[in-house]
Regions:
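N-terminal active-site segment of His-dependent metallophosphoesterases
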Residues: 1-72
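Flexible, charged surface loops at secondary-structure boundaries
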Residues: 52-56, 155, 191
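Extended active-site neighborhood of metal-dependent phosphoesterases/phosphodiesterases
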Residues: 72, 77-189
Length: 191
């Protein structure tokens, strides 16, 4: 008999790089209007990943939003954290709308000034960037119109992970296009 798989699931880390600013009136207004601990996300993620690395979990499943608003610097920092965790655990990741800044409003704070001149990660670059944690082990994958993916991974003889990306339904809202639903249905039948 196969031992049961142990999975750890994390979602919505919203990693925010401190290089984007963590003080000043504009930052305080932004931070105070949100339940996220923006300035502390790095330390919170590090503590969680350390605990997971030292646990007996077999796989780590991470669902986006992994970055706060798609900021390239936040993705680069988050990937370094993933790389450290990956030395001890197998990771599977799926991105979401904040990972490519769907609202086109990335922000940087400097005192009383807020600016939007922040380099972001385009949706079609997310999967090459996170490839080793996404589609590398996929037995099936579906590329969306945004260049993001849903994918299937065989975790064991009897367990498949269906990682679904519902970034847009083609009507400006989160969801799936009809062809994507067909692919999902096909994967469920194969499982």
């Amino acid at each position: 008999m196969q031992k049961p798989l142990k999975l750890t699931f994390i979602a919505d880390t919203h990693h925010y790089s401190k290089t984007l600013g963590t003080s000043g009136r504009q930052y305080e207004l932004r931070s105070g209007s949100d339940q996220k601990c923006l300035a502390e996300t790095g330390e919170i993620i590090d503590a969680a990943f350390e605990k997971i690395a030292n646990s007996d979990t077999d796989f780590v499943l991470i669902a986006g939003d992994v970055s706060n608003d798609g900021e390239l610097v936040s993705h680069i920092e988050f990937k370094k954290k993933l790389d450290r965790l990956a030395k001890k655990k197998k990771i599977y990741l799926i991105t979401a709308t904040h990972d490519w800044c769907c609202d086109e409003n990335p922000r940087k704070f400097d005192g009383d000034t807020v600016s939007n001149d922040v380099e972001t990660m385009p949706s079609f670059k997310l999967y090459p960037f996170y490839e080793e944690y996404t589609i590398n082990d996929a037995i099936a994958k579906y590329e969306t119109h945004l260049g993001t993916y849903s994918y299937v991974v065989q975790l064991s003889d009897k367990v498949r992970l269906l990682a679904l990306n519902d970034d847009q339904n083609g009507k400006g809202r989160a969801g799936f296009k009809p062809k994507h639903f067909e692919w999902i249905d096909e994967q469920l039948k194969k499982a």
